Design a protein with these regions (language model features):
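Membrane-interfacial helix-loop segments of redox and metal-homeostasis proteins
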Residues: 1-146
Length: 146
């Protein structure tokens, strides 16, 4: 897959992630019950002690993470690509931790949260693939491939 296609995939994933995290952030601040689907217990997850980190909703952290990744996709510098990969891998690790908490501490699953974890995992893979394939010149810049 070309870098251009990988970038397009990353943009789509980041936009979907923004939608999911945005919805969960909205649900948090409005205090409404989320549409959870069959077999899920979003309310239990979203009101658990792991729904906030130092008073900040984890959904808002996800929203910031997806927005950061999306923004970096339009910057033509190696540092932006490295930053996007780093944010995606931190998001992956944090999502894995939260999924563990869902399964073994909260004893409930939030399909929206799992969807976000899957999206962040895919973004980590796509961004790492782009980074590993990226040609660099002596100035550290990566040629922008549309």
């Amino acid at each position: 897959m070309s870098d251009r296609r990988l970038r397009q995939v990353a943009v789509v994933l980041a936009l979907i992630g923004l939608g999911v995290a945005g919805y969960l952030t909205y649900v948090h601040y409005e205090g409404i019950e989320s549409v959870c689907g069959l077999g899920g217990d979003c309310e239990k997850v979203q009101t658990s002690e792991w729904a906030d980190l130092a008073g900040v909703p984890v959904a808002l952290l996800g929203l910031i993470g997806y927005a950061t990744i999306l923004t970096t996709l339009f910057v033509e510098r190696e540092e932006a690509l490295i930053a996007a990969a780093l944010v995606a891998w931190v998001g992956f690790g944090f999502s894995a931790y939260l999924t563990y908490r869902e399964l073994f501490s909260i004893d409930a699953i939030c399909p929206w949260c799992v969807a976000s974890a899957v999206i962040m995992t895919l973004l980590a893979i796509v961004m790492t693939t782009r980074l590993l394939r990226a040609p660099t010149d002596h100035r550290g810049a990566i040629p922008y491939i549309g």
